[in-house]
Amino acid sequence: VKKKILLKGPLLTRSGYGEQARFALRSLRSREDLFEVFIQPLRWGQTSWTSDMDEERLWIDQTIEKTIGYIQQGGQFDVSLQVTIPNEFERLAPFNVGYTAGIETTKIAHQWIPKANEMDKVIVVSSHSKQVFENTEYQAQNTQTGEQVLLKTQIPVEAVGYPVKTFDNLPELELGLSTAFNFLTVAQFGPRKNLQNTIKWFVEEFRNDDVGLVVKSNIAKNCLMDRNKLHGDLTNFLRQQGERQCKVYLLHGDMTDAEMHSLYNNERIDAFVSLPHGEGFGLPLFEAAYSGLPVVTVGWSGQLDFLVDTEGQEQFYNVAFDLQPVQKEVVWDGVIAAESMWAYAREGSAKEKMRLCYENVKNDTVAWNNTRLSERFSENVMYENFINALGIEIDYDWMKTLSQIEII
C-alpha cells in the first residue's frame, strides 16, 4: 500500500539542485511507512559529483540499481518527484510533482508556465520563488483559434525551505589567516553572485585596515585547472585595485558539509557578506546565519525567508538596492527572461553596511542573532513541511488499521 515514488534529480552532484534533491530524499526517507523510493540520478551542468561514501550514499547506489531493474521489468510508479528546472518537467506517473529552486528574478520564463501546468503540484524553495510563479503572466495566442489567451500558472505552488544541518563533531580547519578581522563570502564565480563588485568594494572600503575577505569559490568545478584559472583571474583583478593592506584569500576545492560548517564556525571568521543579484533561497547565507555569523546582504529575494524573523524584524545588515533589468549576457532562453529584473546592490550602502558590521563585531554591539533559526528550520519541521507540500493523498485508514495489528 506504500506509494511507489520516483525521485528524479541530480542528487549526487555538488550543486544547489543536488542539495535540493538530497533534502527531498531525506524527507521521503523520514516516512518509510508511506513511500517506497526509487531514484533516477541526473547530471547537473559542469558541477562536480559528491565524493562522500557514507550510509546515505550506499543506500542511494543500491536504490539506483533497484530502480534500473524495476524499470526493465516494466514497473510503474504512483508518483514522480522531479528536481530540476521546469523546462524538463514531464508526466512520468499518475501524480507528478515538480520541485524547482524557482527563479532569482522578478519573472519566470514563459516556457515554464505550460510545463508547470503539466504537473499536479510545484514545490519551490522560497516565498520569493512562489510569488514570482504565481504573479507572472503573459499574453499568448492560441495557435489553432488565433484567440488571445492569458498564460499563467494554474496549479498549486508551495514554498518549503531547507533544514539546518547539525554535526556532533566538526573537523578543525587551519586557515592560516594573518588579518585580525575576516569576512567570508561563498559563491560560484558567475554574474548572478556579483563577486567582482563584492571584492572591489571590500578592497576600497578596507584598503588600509587589518581586515581580510575569504572567498570560497570556483568557476565550474572543484578541480586544479579550475583553481588555477580562478587564482589567475583574481590575482589580475586585485592588481588593478592598487596598493592595499587588506587581504583577499581564495579558498577553492571540494569541501564536505561538515568542513563548510567548520568554516562558518571558525574563530578566525567574524562575519559573512554576500551581494547577489538574487537568490532562489541562498543556502550559504542560511548556513552562515544559523551558525551565528552576522550577515551583510541585499534585502531582496529568497534570503528574506530566514533573515527576517517571525515578527517581521530584520536580522541582518540590509544593503540597499535597485531593481533593474538583468544583464544581456545572463539572458538564457527558457530560463532567465530578457524582460525580467533583479537587484543591484548600491555601492555606497554595501560599503556602509560592511563597515557598520565590522565596527559592531569589534565593539561587541551586534544588535541581533539568528539562534532561533535552529527551531524554525529543524530537520523534523522541514521534513514534515515537505511531505505535506507534496499534496499526495495518504490512506490513513490503512495506516490506522496497520498500527492496530498485534504481533502474535
Task: Please report, for each region that a protein language model flagged, where it lies by residue.
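A charged, aromatic-enriched C-terminal amphipathic alpha-helix characteristic of glycosyltransferases
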Residues: M341-S349, E359-L390
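Short hydrophobic beta-strand element within catalytic cores of glycosyltransferases
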Residues: P294-T297, V308, E314-N318
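Donor nucleotide-sugar binding/catalytic pocket of nucleotide-sugar-dependent glycosyltransferases
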Residues: K121-N169, A320
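Aromatic "clamp/platform" in nucleotide-sugar-dependent glycosyltransferases that forms part
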Residues: H277
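Nucleotide-activated donor-binding/catalytic signature segment of Leloir-type glycosyltransferases, i.e.
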Residues: L224-L263, D270-A271
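N-terminal pre-catalytic "stem/leader" segment of glycosyltransferase-like enzymes
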Residues: V1-Q76, E384
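Extended catalytic core of nucleotide-activated donor transferases of GT-like folds
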Residues: L6-K8, Q46-V132
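Conserved donor-binding/catalytic core segment of Leloir-type glycosyltransferases
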Residues: L6, G176-K193, I199-F202, L213-V215
